[in-house]
């Protein structure tokens, strides 16, 4: 049983797919003795105006601020945001970040350009899945080149949907060179690699990324790792934390990271 329980990827009902308020989730955090959590509601840059993310992120920010005040001394509550596809419109992404002060910014890719989120796609073939995944990795590199974020979220995100919708398992060895390029750039830019446990609650039953990728990140000079449950329900808060911490320790990390005012702080994994 780990004592330093920190979940840095949690969504409220201000995310389109979220289900509970920040206050309700913090009540759950206090009951389960979670030490800290970061709320990181979605802000998909390529559908910012269409899906009214301006209103969503404003509501999220102020509701989290209220939760910070209410739970001060009980749970460390951090202000975050998950920027989806920020490099598709860098000017807008920078404008969003300039509006408010965040403790952490998660960078993610949920969809390729002018396509749906992988979550909404109906099915895949071996050929299409490999094509999508190769292009996804290219977009991750683009995200890193843009660079104004702190945590690289759920690397290998599409794999969970290739499997759940079409039973396809990607041979990761085909992409080892490109994944190494991503991990090396993540390390060089001082970004944290998130170990995301959402896949453990889905048919694929795997972390994103898996332990071997986390280990490779360490080998390539990675310093910062974070845990994110990617909870969209209060009951999923910190779910999979033990498996994620185990993967970090197996990879050679003795410390995990949390961010305050976008500054990384190392904490022992214990």
Question: Locations of the language-model features?
Answer:
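An N-terminally biased module of ancient metal coordination in phosphate/nucleic-acid-related enzymes
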Residues: 1-90, 94-101, 161-173, 197, ...
């Amino acid at each position: 049983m780990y004592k330093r329980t920190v979940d840095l990827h949690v969504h409220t009902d201000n995310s389109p797919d979220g289900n509970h308020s920040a206050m309700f989730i913090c009540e759950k955090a206090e009951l389960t003795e979670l030490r800290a959590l970061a709320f990181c509601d979605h802000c998909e840059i390529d559908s910012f105006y269409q899906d009214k993310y301006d209103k969503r992120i404003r509501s999220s920010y102020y509701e989290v601020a209220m939760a910070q005040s209410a739970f001060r001394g009980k749970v460390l509550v951090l202000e975050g945001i998950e920027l989806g596809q920020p490099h598709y419109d860098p000017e807008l992404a920078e404008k969003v970040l300039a509006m408010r002060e965040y403790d952490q910014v998660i960078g993610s890719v949920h969809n390729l350009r002018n396509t749906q989120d992988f979550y909404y796609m109906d099915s895949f073939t071996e050929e299409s899945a490999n094509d999508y995944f190769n292009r996804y990795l290219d977009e991750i590199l683009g995200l890193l080149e843009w660079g104004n974020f702190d945590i690289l979220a759920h690397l290998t995100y599409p794999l969970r949907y290739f499997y759940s919708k079409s039973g396809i398992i990607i041979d990761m060895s085909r992409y080892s060179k490109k994944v190494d390029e991503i991990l090396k750039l993540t390390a060089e830019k001082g970004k944290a690699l998130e170990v995301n446990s959402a896949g453990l609650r889905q048919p694929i039953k795997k972390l994103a990324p898996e332990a071997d990728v986390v280990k490779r990140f360490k080998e390539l000079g990675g310093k910062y790792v974070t845990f994110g449950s990617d909870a969209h329900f209060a009951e999923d808060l910190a779910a999979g934390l033990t498996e994620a911490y185990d993967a970090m320790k197996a990879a050679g990390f003795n410390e995990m990271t949390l961010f305050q005012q976008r500054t990384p702080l190392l904490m022992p994994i214990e």
